[in-house]
Design a protein with these regions (language model features):
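Mobile gating loops/cap/lid regions near enzyme active sites that modulate substrate access
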Residues: 383, 425, 429-620
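Short, solvent-exposed loop/turn elements at domain surfaces
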Residues: 53, 61-68, 327-328, 378-381, ...
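Hydrophobic h-region of N-terminal signal peptides that target proteins for export
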Residues: 14-22
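Substrate-gating cap/lid region and adjacent catalytic-acid/histidine neighborhood
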Residues: 259-269, 302-489, 500, 507, ...
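Sec-dependent signal peptide recognition
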Residues: 5-12
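Serine-hydrolase-like catalytic core of hydrolytic proteins
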Residues: 56, 98-308, 348-351, 356-384, ...
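Non-catalytic accessory segments of hydrolases
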Residues: 2, 21-200, 479-497, 508-514, ...
Length: 620
């Protein structure tokens, strides 16, 4: 997402768009039709008018700090009937729109470490014939692994229209979800606790709960699809290469995610200066705690002290610190406090081969994969760049339309290549025949308040989610993002996407959708000139169609070098450098050789990287 210092009008627009598919805060009443018994006891849910739902079911517990940076404790059995009528605790994070915190608390530390809850939605005919169990789709939310929660999106329309069961899960975030310090992991009693990828371990624990219990809700435990967007997509990819997750799911959907793991060496090292394209360091977090506790006067003395403290002293410091102290230390050690935390190859949960290496080596070979990105992913993240946008009467304006679209195109193409095209091509060449790829191109936003939303946002990051969930709040959307003119086509496109997603969940192949009447979505074919992926767009922009186009590293660099929409060659150098530094597209020497050595005499640190270090305000 992007910063709260973004213009008020854009906040309203985006909040309305994203919140259109969120779950209204309503007091739900018990429905006796939802009374059932699961492994820990009896439970009752509610009827939201469209589906049955059971909210706030605890699948694991973090009862105190002794369980911090460990697998969650098993939940206890209960007496009586558990009322699953409201969502469970939010995991610790900064208050924001995407964790449904009240606006006055945006930027505050909110939530609880004891947050391992999930929610279940089922069609209202689910108990009519329990011999006909339904496919299960487990949603892993996004938010850079530092924010978000399971109650932000409402899957009721997907559930009711496509006859599937959806489970959404919370998982630990930020320094509680991804943290690897030698003095914590060295005394761990099992491989999971040694991992450091605790947010991914939470997902595995939730999937184990699904295997034990989903049949009580009418679901098929032998037909589970995991799907997630952004960081949730990264976490889906990590689960594909985690041996502990083997057999817990049978299909996987990665929406605007990626496969590049985090840097385990960086996470455990001392860093005199954090880099904006890296995640935080556990060593530096401890340094900050030592300063906060007045055990050291500054960072350098803290590093010296840390080296001389025993393992037990370091662990005691970390476990005795309050939730707020841990999080404040974490925020203080990051250049960009909303930079995404990626699962790292710890050798316990995630193989040292990484995600792609694990898949290419044959692990989880039989799991069909759907993977895709949005055409204009990066527009959402570029909005806060004052060199590309300006503010006029509190309304964002594009400074140079050609440059804006060009920068977004090349940065978004880099994402697509690394997250979709490269892994799909490599996996299918290695023998996989069940990789299905897409690109979401819908960009029919109207012009509102003088803002050209079609160009400003287009098919931006996360904008496909309401189409997949199918829940559009017409009052909010027609006022800000959608219009009465395009609403009918939006709903038609959404219905098609839900149908493809559901058919994939049923049979592992999106095919022609549930009704068999849509464009045939074929698997990625690595052959030259063969169809590769499907495009989702409005009818007047080409509609739903297959294409044989795909990206390579060489093509990306050539497209950038020959783009006449970018007049200043320094922008081309910066775009390539960003792809190298942030995305690991290629090696640094490629920048020096780029476009007849145009960039070789430039110093990235003074020409453009200085802008990357600017302190970011809280993203909402």
């Amino acid at each position: 997402m992007f910063s709260v210092n973004i213009k008020k009008i854009l906040l309203v627009i985006l909040a309305s768009y994203l919140a259109s598919c969120s779950i209204p805060k309503t007091d739900f009443e018990q429905d006796q039709n939802t009374l059932l018994t699961i492994d820990k006891g009896s439970i009752i849910g509610s009827n939201n008018g469209n589906t049955y739902q059971w909210l706030g079911i605890q699948y694991g517990s973090i009862p105190d700090s002794s369980y911090r940076w460990k697998r969650g404790a098993e939940t206890e059995k209960w007496d009586g009937v558990y009322e699953a009528l409201e969502f469970g605790n939010t995991c610790v994070q900064k208050g924001s729109l995407i964790n449904t915190t009240k606006r006055r608390n945006w930027g505050d530390i909110v939530g609880s470490e004891d947050c391992l809850y999930l929610n279940v939605w089922a069609p209202k005919d689910v108990f009519d014939d329990l011999s006909q169990s339904k496919p299960v789709m487990v949603w892993i939310h996004g938010g850079s692994n530092v924010s978000g929660n399971a109650d932000f999106y409402d899957p009721s329309e997907l559930v009711s229209s496509q006859d599937v069961i959806v489970v959404s899960i919370n998982y630990r975030l930020g320094p509680f979800g991804w943290f690897r310090h030698p003095d914590i992991t060295s005394t761990a009693q099992n491989p999971e606790d040694q991992s450091g990828n605790y947010g991914n371990i939470d997902s595995i624990q939730a999937l184990e709960w699904v295997q034990r219990n989903i049949e009580f809700f009418g679901g098929d435990s032998s037909n589970v699809t995991i799907f997630g967007e952004s960081a949730g997509g990264y976490n889906v990819a990590a689960l594909l290469s985690a041996k502990q997750a083997n057999g817990l799911f049978h299909k996987a959907i990665i929406q605007s995610g990626g496969i590049r793991p985090g840097d385990i060496e960086h996470s455990e090292s001392y860093l005199e200066k954090n880099l904006p394209w890296k995640s935080y360091s556990s060593r530096e977090l401890v340094n900050e705690l030592l300063v906060m506790n007045e055990m050291a006067s500054d960072r350098n003395s803290a590093a010296t002290l840390q080296e001389n403290l025993s393992q037990k002293e370091i662990e005691a410091l970390m476990r005795n610190a309050s939730t707020a102290e841990i999080y404040e230390a974490y925020l203080a050690t990051k250049t960009n406090t909303d930079d995404m935390l990626r699962p790292f190859p710890d050798g316990n949960l995630l193989s040292e081969l990484g995600i792609l290496g694990s898949l290419e080596s044959g692990f989880n070979m039989d799991v069909p994969i759907m993977i895709g990105t949005n055409r204009d992913e990066m527009k959402l993240f570029l909005l806060n760049n004052p060199r590309l946008t300006r503010e006029f009467l509190r309304i964002p304006r594009i400074r140079d339309l050609d440059l804006w679209n060009a920068v977004s195109k090349h940065r978004s193409n880099s994402w697509k290549y690394l997250a979709v095209d490269e892994p799909a091509q490599n996996l299918t060449r290695s023998g996989r025949s069940n990789i299905y790829a897409y690109r979401f191109d819908w960009d029919d936003e109207p012009r509102k308040y003088g803002v050209d939303l079609k160009n400003l946002l287009g098919a931006a990051h996360a904008f496909e989610i309401p189409f997949v969930m199918g829940n559009f709040d017409e009052d909010a959307l027609t006022k800000y993002i959608l219009s009465r003119k395009n609403m009918e086509e939006v709903k038609t496109l959404s219905q098609s996407m839900m149908s493809y997603w559901a058919e994939f969940a049923y049979n592992g192949d999106p095919d022609k959708g549930r009704e068999g009447n849509l464009t045939d979505w074929k698997a990625w074919d690595p052959g030259k000139g063969r169809e590769k992926y499907i495009i989702f767009d409005s009818t007047h922009d080409g509609g739903i169609r297959m294409t044989n186009d795909y990206l390579t590293e060489e093509k990306l660099i050539e497209m950038l070098a020959t783009d006449n929409k970018i007049q200043d060659y320094k922008w081309k150098c910066e775009i390539l450098d960003a792809a190298i530094m942030f995305d690991h597209l290629t090696t640094q020497n490629v920048l020096n050789d780029f476009n007849n050595n145009q960039c070789s005499d430039l110093d990235p640190s003074t020409e453009w990287r200085k802008y990357w270090y600017d302190e970011k305000e809280q993203r909402y």
